[in-house]
Amino acid sequence: MITLKEALKLSKDEILALRKELKDKILKTKDLGAYIEQLTGEDLNESGSGIPIAIKDNIQVKNWSVTSASNILQGYVAPYDATVITKLRSAGFAPFGRTNMDEFAMGSTTESSFYGKTLNPTDYSRVPGGSSGGSAAAVAAGIAVAALGSDTGGSIRQPAAFCGCVGFKPTYGRVSRYGLAAYSSSLDQIGPITQNVTDAAILFDVIAGYDKMDSTSYSKEFISTADKLNSDRKLTIAVIENFVNETKDEVKSALLKTIEKLKSAGHKIIYKNLLNSKYNIAAYYIIATAEASTNLSRYDGVRYGNRAKASNLNELYANTRSAGFGEEVQRRMLLGTFVLSSGYYDAYYIKAQKARAYIKKEYEKILDEADLIFMPIAPSVAYKFGELANPLDAYLSDVYTIGVNLAGLPAISVPIAKNSENLNISAQLIGRAYDEQTVLDGALNLEKIIKG
């Protein structure tokens, strides 16, 4: 598939030909489940203009059906463009196709979608990761030039890692969340999934910047990164030794080899440890589910979306939510409601917020001594469907990504190796808040080292 950088040089006729080619490929690969079944209308308008960018199904695109892969939003049509979509259009890009996802971005396998699961292009028996699994699978399968996803606890980086592409989560507040269906408002962040690091920088530059429509948007002027990329910068990189040592043998081996390559390339490597990852999991799932229980309370069948039959208002709420929300979403909403209840608020939610502050300080302390942090994306390669049937086991697959969201830092997933079964292994680079340039420079150098 043509890269985003190459696509910028195309004429209008060549872009039209690219859109037609993509539409044909998407229709021929429906079994992959990367795109939601609705393959007609403006979302795949081959006669439109603009370089095509695949869009996760929780980002508002005017006149599109946008459902967050949930039954409860069937029939909802977005009345406006999200800020990132407005920015795409202004820069000569265009939304092109809705990608599949875990329902309301709650999951790490893209199995909980109302539309059915997405497969991993490398091995159809394995998960593509999630929740932005459709976006990652589309890019990896060559049926998207690039895509937008959202990352609440690793939902861009982990599927990018499992599918073998680049996934970039900007600093919290760097990219506007206006028009993103909220899961956890203090953790959600939109970002690119691309074929390479340069493309990630290009797409990031398009969508980044202050937005008055988002109260959490970073107000300082954004300075573009793509035109300043430097793959020759020598950096101090902190390896999180305890996290590397916890991973499965094949992942650990690939990470250790990559560390040696970084040393050989002239980077200074220091070794650090972070707080036991179980604290990240506990704090994240308390905070995220608490915010989700509030955010998803707006879906009641009254104003928009699917509505169940009922004889009174309470019955309408109960029936609509019972039929509209999937099992995982209901589980997280119940957990969130529980931790916010009067008897448990201090015991759980307040403690989780204190833990979050401590986790953030830990990352910042390491980044006072280093330019970047190096750690795994996941403990293993992509696992088989049904392998992690217990929800708690599935939650642990995000163990190395969620801390970054709790700290609000920028991070990128870069492919570093394949195992004996040709499955992808990636590493994660994390930087200081709002210093995306260093993250992208380090990632570009790592990409160059790996590709030789």
Swiss-Prot record:
Catalysed conversion reaction: L-glutamyl-tRNA(Gln) + L-glutamine + ATP + H2O = L-glutaminyl-tRNA(Gln) + L-glutamate + ADP + phosphate + H(+)
Pfam families in UniProt: Amidase
Enzyme Commission code: 6.3.5.7
UniProt-annotated catalytic positions: K56 (charge relay system), S131 (charge relay system), S155 (acyl-ester intermediate)
InterPro entries for this protein: Amidase, Amidase_CS, Amidase_dom, AS_sf, GatA
BP-aspect Gene Ontology terms: translation
Keywords: ATP-binding, Ligase, Nucleotide-binding, Protein biosynthesis
Superkingdom in the source lineage: Bacteria
Sample GO molecular function, one term: glutaminyl-tRNA synthase (glutamine-hydrolyzing) activity
Known role: Allows the formation of correctly charged Gln-tRNA(Gln) through the transamidation of misacylated Glu-tRNA(Gln) in organisms which lack glutaminyl-tRNA synthetase. The reaction takes place in the presence of glutamine and ATP through an activated gamma-phospho-Glu-tRNA(Gln).
Annotated family: Belongs to the amidase family. GatA subfamily.
Assembly and oligomerization: Heterotrimer of A, B and C subunits.
UniProt cross-references to PANTHER family, sorted A to Z: GLUTAMYL-TRNA(GLN) AMIDOTRANSFERASE SUBUNIT A, TRANSAMIDASE
Name used for this protein in its record: Glutamyl-tRNA(Gln) amidotransferase subunit A
Gene: gatA
